[in-house]
Amino acid sequence: MRRVWLLAVLVGCAGADAMTSQQPAAAAEAEPADTLGLHPGETMAFEVHLSGVLAGEAQLAVGQPGELDGRQVIVVKSRAATAGAAALLKQISDEATSVIDVETGRPISLESLIVNSGKRTTASAKFSGGSAEVTYQRPTDAAPKTQKLNFGNVIVNDAHTAMAQLRGWKATKGSVRTVYVIGGRRLWRIDVTYAGEQTIGSSLGNRRAIMFEGKSYRAKPNMTVESTKPARTFTVWLSDDADRVPLKVTATTELGDIIMDLTDYSR
């Protein structure tokens, strides 16, 4: 379970491939979000079910704005771990910390730690304009390895800023946008369509929600997709209010249907 906690990126970039093989259309223009998409001091908790069985739990917390090298920044932390029967089979946890530029909504740095049955994998990324320097160390690596990626004029996000971009996007029905996301050492292209509004049931009661349908693709550093890899599909519901809280995410994978539900929110 790699970062199984977070709206589009959660299901788009984790788990098994969805059973569809269609190739993506040309990337939609990635216009900036209307707002930052993060609220200082907010916290969220989620449960993840696989084929109806509890498989994971996750938490996310947003800090208060501060200053770093003359820029206003905000820190976002998240943690996901196996739970229930899944935890009896394998203990996996994934922690990530992002420093985000408040003005642009872009990531400045990312630190992550994955522990899989006691084996640790670390990864960090430093973002500057259209480039990123990624350092990682797997359990089998004697020392950390570093690679530099150049994306030109394309804006690249981490999981936290991708979530924020979606929350801050005030779209009209049928609108499509493309977001590129770094997850570990891998680059993903995520295409999201604003599908409309509906009322859904949740652990917090019936809520009016806005719905997004998405597809994610493994991408190369030149932003083209790896054509031999099938697309992954997912649906995201955000609360239809000023908070735009992720209420629910669903996806169909070869492992079964994945459902992530919000269980607690405060700000």
Where on the chain are the PLM-derived regions?
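Short, intrinsically disordered low-complexity segments
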Residues: M1-R2, G70
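Low-complexity, intrinsically disordered regions enriched in charged/polar residues
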Residues: V4, V156-H160, Y194
